[in-house]
């Protein structure tokens, strides 16, 4: 069963500003924030390290939006919005992933993240 579908915005260094803007607009709270420099083995420069790897904005305990920055210059203007589909079980997630993978392009393989 799908628990939620959440818009996931990707930016080229503007995720912090967008997160602050939507936090104010929707009177929401930041419930999760990770930066590139926090990842194991990070070897980028300080500017890249301060970019948002993943952030969650929620209201009334429900996720509104997810945010992230890319590595500088790697943002494709046509791919700035994705949908994160949250399943109630891992088995349902894997089943959907396998079926979608048959005709789609896997950008990120199944892995533990946030």
Placement of each model-derived feature along the sequence:
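Alpha-helical interaction segments
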Residues: 1, 11-12, 87
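Core segments of cupin and vicinal oxygen chelate
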Residues: 9-62
């Amino acid at each position: 069963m799908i628990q939620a579908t959440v818009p996931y915005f990707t930016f080229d260094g503007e995720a912090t500003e967008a997160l602050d803007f939507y936090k104010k607009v929707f009177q929401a709270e930041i419930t999760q924030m990770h930066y590139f420099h926090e990842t194991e083995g990070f070897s980028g420069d300080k500017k890249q390290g301060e970019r948002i790897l993943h952030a969650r904005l929620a209201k009334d305990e429900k996720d509104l939006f997810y945010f992230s920055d890319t590595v500088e210059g790697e943002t494709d203007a046509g791919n700035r919005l994705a949908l994160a589909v949250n399943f109630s079980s891992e088995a349902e997630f894997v089943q959907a992933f396998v079926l979608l993978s048959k005709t789609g392009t896997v950008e990120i393989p199944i892995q533990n993240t946030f």
